Amino acid sequence: GALGLSFSRSLLRDARLRRISFRRHHLEGVDFSGADLVGCDFREAVLTECSLRGANLTDARFEDADLREADLGALKLADASRFRGAAISRRQAAELLSGLGLKVM
């Protein structure tokens, strides 16, 4: 990345990582649970076995990211625009819709 850092297999729970660019990076096994990711750029990134559960995603960008193997936690409909064009799995789609009160059959 711009900082020349690698975060693979890293525990970054509750870390303050505002406005860092992870654009086009492949992040593997990174736990961002509860992290402050305000303004971070994950566009076109691949998140494999990563967790975003409970992270602050205000102004974060995920357009065209591959999130199929990431734990997204409970996303809100208001967050949906941040994920435009991102790839998610059928399971994740069902979880998102279920969180909105819809029954996925």
Mark where each language-model region is.
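Tandem repeat scaffolds
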Residues: 1-105
